[in-house]
């Protein structure tokens, strides 16, 4: 676990840069995510990931002759607090904003940044979203200034349900999700896609619970047991996943789990406690055990430096593509960066090609369905020192993950 005092020290100073970066004439990236409160476990790992990437890029000379500098801001997973923090970031000279945890936060930031850009021509900002996956952000609420590197929740559910439709042992499914825009999107997509692909499956429960406020999931697990479900689908993340699985372990609940974020901090430990060996599945853009030499070497270096696994291959794609776009544009102007990112094709962290769709600024990339359990000789990494690690069950090429968009974007004139 990353020291909270370590993070707090850098938040207090407002700077977390590559080791050789200096404050003046750097490419400032404001990292706005939870560094305190219930979401801090994932926010801290995200911050270290961006620190690692700043160091990596700066060691290669940065971009357009400038070094990268990470400015951390604690939003406490709160949309209103995020708007306070983004204004602070702008005041400190940041014109590149990144955030990932919480689609309600993402929606607030995207709207604020779009309006800021309208009011401040020539001083525009760009928002790089590495993990907030409500589909609306690249559909009805798309903006030119917003780019997303994680697959949206509909893309992920499409992949999961395509796999699930072939699993004939699935008869009864229980949905449990966080009660905000993302969780609501997960339940909607799961219900509609299961009905279309496996109409014989019964949805025996559909539960929403408060975001990052539940400390004991035992009552929810009791409902799942009583329903007779053989399978649970959840988009829960951070402590809402870890505590949910801990309660499942305590109750001896023996079901299959189809998840988005089983790999988040605390998740693998809770999964191991359930004893559900390769019965907890996740849809991800990669994993430590993908057979790819370059990413496994980076994984090893990341773990040696921080003592945690790399949960954000998408952040690697984002930062490396940002550097490529800056070099292509030969400019750090956000509008020019955005134009350079559009339709960019890129070799992704775990191998294979991804592309940034111009129509809506959604990044498409190879996706993996993985399960957590005992590791074999071709799976070198475990998770959270549990002895369990990821195994690839299915891989989808980027072209096979594409869904249509309703985005009607106002573009720079």
PLM regions: where:
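Bacterial N-terminal signal peptides
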Residues: 8-17
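Sec/Tat signal peptide C-region and signal peptidase I cleavage site
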Residues: 18-23
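Beta-alpha junction/loop-to-helix N-cap segments that form part of ligand/metal-binding clefts
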Residues: 26, 41-48, 60-137, 149, ...
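Solvent-exposed, acidic/polar segments of extracytosolic/periplasmic ligand-binding ectodomains
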Residues: 27, 346-413
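Extracytoplasmic "Venus flytrap"
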Residues: 30-51, 73-80, 101-102, 176-185, ...
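Extracellular/periplasmic Venus flytrap/periplasmic-binding protein
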Residues: 80-84, 135-136, 144-252, 288-297
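Periplasmic-binding protein-like
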Residues: 89-103, 120-130, 172-177, 228-238, ...
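Extracellular/periplasmic periplasmic-binding protein-like sensory domains
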Residues: 143, 245-319, 327-332, 376, ...
């Amino acid at each position: 676990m990353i020291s909270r005092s370590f993070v707090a020290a850098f938040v207090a100073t407002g700077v977390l840069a590559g080791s050789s970066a200096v404050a003046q004439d750097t490419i400032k990236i404001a990292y706005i995510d939870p560094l305190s409160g219930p979401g801090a476990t994932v926010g801290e790992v995200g911050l270290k990931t961006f620190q690692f990437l700043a160091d990596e890029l700066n060691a290669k000379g940065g971009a357009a002759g400038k070094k990268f500098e990470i400015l951390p801001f604690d939003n406490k997973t709160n949309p209103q607090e995020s708007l306070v923090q983004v204004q602070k970031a702008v005041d400190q000279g940041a014109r590149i904003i990144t955030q990932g945890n919480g689609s309600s936060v993402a929606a607030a930031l995207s709207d604020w940044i779009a309006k800021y850009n309208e009011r401040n021509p020539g001083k525009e900002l760009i928002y790089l979203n590495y993990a907030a996956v409500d589909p609306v952000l690249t559909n009805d609420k798309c903006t030119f200034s917003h780019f997303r590197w994680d697959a949206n929740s509909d893309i992920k559910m499409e992949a999961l349900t395509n796999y699930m439709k072939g699993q004939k042992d699935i008869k009864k499914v229980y949905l449990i999700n966080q009660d905000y825009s993302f969780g609501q999107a997960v339940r909607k997509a799961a219900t509609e896609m299961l009905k279309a692909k496996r109409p014989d499956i019964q949805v025996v429960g559909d539960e929403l619970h408060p975001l990052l406020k539940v400390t004991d999931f035992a009552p929810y697990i009791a409902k799942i047991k009583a329903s007779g479900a053989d399978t649970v689908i959840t988009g829960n993340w951070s402590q809402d996943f870890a505590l949910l699985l801990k309660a499942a372990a305590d109750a001896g609940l023996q079901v299959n789990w189809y998840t988005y974020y089983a790999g988040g901090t605390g998740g693998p430990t809770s999964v191991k406690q359930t004893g559900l060996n390769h019965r907890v599945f996740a849809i991800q853009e990669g994993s430590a055990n993908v057979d790819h030499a370059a990413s496994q070497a980076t994984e090893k270096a990341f773990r040696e430096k921080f003592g945690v696994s790399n949960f954000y291959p998408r952040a690697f794609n984002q930062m490396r593509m940002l550097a490529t776009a800056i070099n292509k544009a030969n400019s750090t102007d956000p509008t020019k960066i955005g134009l350079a990112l559009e339709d960019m094709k890129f070799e992704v962290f775990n191998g294979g090609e991804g592309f940034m769709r111009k129509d809506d600024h959604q990044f498409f990339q190879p996706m993996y369905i993985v399960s957590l359990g005992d590791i074999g000789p071709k799976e070198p990494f475990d998770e959270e020192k549990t002895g369990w690690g990821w195994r690839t069950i299915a891989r989808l090429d980027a072209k096979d993950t594409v869904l249509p968009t309703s985005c009607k974007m106002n573009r720079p004139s």
